């Protein structure tokens, strides 16, 4: 490859690293072209799987500010550049590797953090981002409902207290009216007639 072509390839790969939420490095030795095509289909639209040259990709990673991958650029390497959900891509790679043991996950970088192959496997065991967000929203809704109940309880207690005071005053004034009339009648009876 001529120098201008290498420079262009490095720039393209560096841009892939910058635009990706994750980049997973794999060894693809022993996979057929049809298996690689199937893997690309498995990863879907949120990822691009590319066979790369180690030296050029190492330089591109450095240019993109991606660190911690130097030891992974050994042997035949392909990179899954993920622009979508990293968990879904990790699941796709894990499932494909189970069916095709020739695919070996070496490691990668997820949202700027270098990860080992074991960490990528653990990432694949997580639930998808959408499911985790739904669970978080459900937990927050339950917490908010509880908080609303806590805030509403004192208000309803104040309303019940105000109603009880109003009823008590009404019954006191009703009880005081006959007593006041009886007192006036008694005073009138005791008073000498002129």
Swiss-Prot record:
The Gene Ontology biological process terms listed for this entry are:
translation
InterPro entries registered for this protein in UniProt = Ribosomal_uL10, Ribosomal_uL10-like_sf, Ribosomal_uL10_bac, Ribosomal_uL10_bac_type, Ribosomal_uL10_CS_bac
HAMAP family per UniProt: Ribosomal_uL10
Q: Which gene encodes it?
A: rplJ
- Species, as recorded: Frankia alni (strain DSM 45986 / CECT 9034 / ACN14a)
Name the keywords, alphabetized: Ribonucleoprotein, Ribosomal protein, RNA-binding, rRNA-binding
The UniProt entry, under CDD domains, shows:
Ribosomal_L10 (cd05797)
For this record, an example GO cellular component is: large ribosomal subunit
Family annotation (Pfam families)? Ribosomal_L10
The UniProt entry's sequence similarity note says: Belongs to the universal ribosomal protein uL10 family.
The name this protein goes by in its record = Large ribosomal subunit protein uL10
């Amino acid at each position: 490859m001529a120098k201008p072509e290498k420079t262009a390839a490095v720039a393209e790969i560096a841009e892939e690293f910058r635009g990706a939420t994750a980049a997973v490095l794999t060894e693809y030795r022993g996979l057929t072209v049809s298996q690689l095509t199937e893997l690309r289909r498995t990863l879907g639209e949120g990822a691009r799987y590319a066979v790369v040259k180690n030296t050029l990709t190492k330089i591109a990673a450095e240019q993109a500010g991606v660190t911690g991958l130097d030891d992974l650029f050994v042997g035949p390497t392909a990179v899954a550049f993920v622009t979508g959900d990293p968990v879904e891509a990790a699941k796709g790679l894990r499932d494909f590797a189970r069916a095709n043991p020739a695919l070996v996950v070496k490691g990668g970088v997820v949202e700027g953090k270098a990860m080992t192959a074991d960490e990528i496997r653990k990432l694949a065991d997580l639930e998808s981002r959408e499911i985790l967000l739904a669970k978080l929203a459900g937990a927050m809704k339950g917490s908010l409902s509880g908080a609303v109940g806590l805030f509403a309880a004192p208000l309803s207690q104040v309303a019940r207290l105000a109603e009880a005071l109003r009823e008590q005053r009404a019954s006191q004034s009703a009880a005081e009216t006959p007593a006041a009339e009886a007192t006036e009648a008694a005073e009138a009876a005791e008073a000498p007639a002129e």
